[in-house]
Amino acid sequence: MDAAEPGLPPGPEGRKRYSDIFRSLDNLEISLGNVTLEMLAGDPLLSEDPEPDKTPTATVTNEASCWSGPSPEGPVPLTGEELDLRLIRTKGGVDAALEYAKTWSRYAKELLAWTEKRASYELEFAKSTMKIAEAGKVSIQQQSHMPLQYIYTLFLEHDLSLGTLAMETVAQQKRDYYQPLAAKRTEIEKWRKEFKEQWMKEQKRMNEAVQALRRAQLQYVQRSEDLRARSQGSPEDSAPQASPGPSKQQERRRRSREEAQAKAQEAEALYQACVREANARQQDLEIAKQRIVSHVRKLVFQGDEVLRRVTLSLFGLRGAQAERGPRAFAALAECCAPFEPGQRYQEFVRALRPEAPPPPPPAFSFQEFLPSLNSSPLDIRKKLSGPLPPRLDENSAEPGPWEDPGTGWRWQGTPGPTPGSDVDSVGGGSESRSLDSPTSSPGAGTRQLVKASSTGTESSDDFEERDPDLGDGLENGLGSPFGKWTLSSAAQTHQLRRLRGPAKCRECEAFMVSGTECEECFLTCHKRCLETLLILCGHRRLPARTPLFGVDFLQLPRDFPEEVPFVVTKCTAEIEHRALDVQGIYRVSGSRVRVERLCQAFENGRALVELSGNSPHDVSSVLKRFLQELTEPVIPFHLYDAFISLAKTLHADPGDDPGTPSPSPEVIRSLKTLLVQLPDSNYNTLRHLVAHLFRVAARFMENKMSANNLGIVFGPTLLRPPDGPRAASAIPVTCLLDSGHQAQLVEFLIVHYEQIFGMDELPQATEPPPQDSSPAPGPLTTSSQPPPPHLDPDSQPPVLASDPGPDPQHHSTLEQHPTATPTEIPTPQSDQREDVAEDTKDGGGEVSSQGPEDSLLGTQSRGHFSRQPVKYPRGGVRPVTHQLSSLALVASKLCEETPITSVPRGSLRGRGPSPAAASPEGSPLRRTPLPKHFEITQETARLLSKLDSEAVPRATCCPDVQPEEAEDHL
């Protein structure tokens, strides 16, 4: 566009005018109000604008003159019609106007977001300031005769008033600034979208009309050319024909010309219609352009007007809020200037009432030691270890009386704390409270403050460390200092005192500031949680919480690697103690809340959890949940296929039918071979669980839980398919069939427990085996029972509450033989050893290969039952355990037998399946406590056979050789 365009003056003056118009238009776009030229020229608020001039050719002088209003040399601002005309004549002017409206809307949105966020921060700051001002005002007013107290009270009141003013300003700003500007922005955005849609529709119609016009013009030209070509004809056609009548060819040409002429006329009419349509669309587009540009200009001016109005309102509100601060601080400074240091302290001293000076404290004197004739050294030490005299109180008018009648210092105290005591106000330690301030201890009457050590019933700390709301331990009938609270059986085992610092409750896992803790195990607990506490006192520091559920089986805490997890032993012992006759045990689920509480107690207290007060179904649910949430089951994943393959070979074997034939030795041998491959802890745990389920199934008539039912419950728990891609791609029918095989395998383990694992963990027999009145000890014993426990009293394991008592016949035998040695007392084990020894003698020194119950290792009697963690050796042949009375004879006989492969005593399982371990005649894979015995290997037997010939009669004639003599002999 040049200066010769219509509507602009020609020549250099026109070009200068054109530049001035552009500069004025840019100035108008960034202005803040829609006012007349006079208001824009005389408004002092808009005299300067921080935005620079956008004209690249403008100088610094021109930029300064642009924002100072119109000047005689500067450009004249354009009117609204001139702005619209300028945009209409500019290419893309409508799109530019709509884009400016969009930018204005985005700009207003950013302003609204900034002001809203700033207002929220100011509101939060005002609330926090008012909160701390209220608290500080209350604290300051509680003191008396403090310097500048009135000034700081006014300061805090000023903060409160400023906070209130800030909240009012934020509310007023939302009404006067945010809401009008947001409403105008929404209106502008709505109309902008509407105008943009109209403009796009008009442009689309115009484009369609232009395209139709071009197609009609092309068609008109083509048909006109066709008509012209057909109308001209050839020279032969113009010559007269010889024949008088028209020919057929001439007739066809005539019809073709007429048809071409008709098409040309039709194309001409269509072309003229398209021209008229295009002209109409062009006029509509111009009208729409003028209308849209005009409306956009009005919307922008209205938005600027609203923005200007709300901005002035915002500045007014902020100015009014900011003016109160300097004036108030200036007034506070004027009030603080005349203050003199020490003025309030003088008023405080004058307010005190002088009193008579207190009497001087009594002087201490040396008391010579005078021993008594009837007193023992222990009494003298007790006298010398008496408590120190109480500290004198500065506020008391007379000191507390004390005397020394010869038994140590004594004092008479008064109940309740002394008013104004420094110990009570400052909160001294337990040592100073117990020794220096006798009046701070609860209770009444005379009391000796003796610092005694902890004895399990009273704390070694001061009485004030106890909670005063819980009463005195001496006044409680139960002997507990918590008579006011209901304590569980587990809570009664703790020595509780007041909590000294913030900690976490071991019962509810909640953070607490005030509560109780145990003096011995340092267990922390809420007072309200003492009623439901399940963790017993272990008389040593309680370990940190350990996750037990959902972890790897080998990562569980144990005393030694082969130990059965304490969760399993604890739950099974409790169920066997009082729940073997409960109907539906392991089938009926417990309460979810109580089960969660028990699981949490196990993780917090480990084996110190008290289960006697819980429902048997809750305990069984905890055991099932523990086994189900293991990352790898008791039977590892890599042995799953082998066990399932073995289970598929088993036939349905109803365990309740007494006439059911025993399984084939091959099945037992294969199962033992698989069990040998289990890790030590897994094997012990599986054996313990199967033994427990055997006892549960034995009470089928009472609890209605047969071996089949228990197999259904524990099959998918003990034997789970492996996780991973293989499990994801498994066929559902196969998984369903495997569940049946899992239950069948567990049922088979329960029914045939005696043949698979042995008799070590079976319950006591109802009728003990008969005993002979005077049995004679045989020369050789194959029992793996340990020696009598009285030989080493320190090695006896503690007897659990759920363990069965000793054999009554055994006690009667002990009474009948009060002077007999342990080897002479007839017991069921000695009878069994006699039978095995006789069989050995009859066989010429060869051990008979019979069933598992008659093998060389033998089996435990039904009277033997123990839940102590033991090591069960597997695989190989054990060393022969013999009597001391026939040591030489056994050695001479063993020299003639086949070599015996010895297994180390510390080995829990063989390195691989051996023939002796795989055969049913070999070891039954029992894991029993190893007794103190002598191991006869091939080399030892060879050496013993070379002893002097006199050693054989001496060993034969002396069946009652003591163990010490035998050891010396060896």
Swiss-Prot record:
Keywords: Coiled coil, GTPase activation, Metal-binding, Phosphoprotein, Zinc, Zinc-finger
Bias kind Acidic residues: ranges: 459-472
Site (described: Arginine finger): 587
Annotated region (Disordered), positions in chain: 44-76, 224-263, 377-478, 762-878, 897-932
Residue numbers of Phosphothreonine PTMs: 660
InterPro entries: AH/BAR_dom_sf, C1-like_sf, F_BAR, GMIP/FCHO2-like_FCH, PE/DAG-bd, Rho_GTPase_activation_prot, RhoGAP, RhoGAP_dom
Any one GO BP annotation for this protein: small GTPase-mediated signal transduction
Coiled-coil regions listed: none
GO cellular component, one term: nucleoplasm
Ranges of Pro residues composition bias in the record: 766-778
Chain intervals annotated as zinc finger (Phorbol-ester/DAG-type): 493-537
Biased composition (Basic and acidic residues): 831-844
Alphabetized Gene3D superfamilies for the sequence: 3.30.60.20, Arfaptin homology (AH) domain/BAR domain (1.20.1270.60), Rho GTPase activation protein (1.10.555.10)
Domain Rho-GAP: 554-757
Sample GO molecular function, one term: zinc ion binding
Skewed-composition ranges (Polar residues): 56-65, 231-246, 815-830, 847-863
Modification Phosphoserine occurs at: 19, 71, 231, 234, 243, 437, 441, 885, 907, 914, 919, 923
Compositionally biased tracts (Low complexity): 910-923
Assembly and binders: Interacts with GEM through its N-terminal.
Role played: Stimulates, in vitro and in vivo, the GTPase activity of RhoA.
Classification via PANTHER family: GEM-INTERACTING PROTEIN, SPERMATHECAL PHYSIOLOGY VARIANT
Protein name: GEM-interacting protein
Organism for this UniProt entry: Homo sapiens
Gene: GMIP
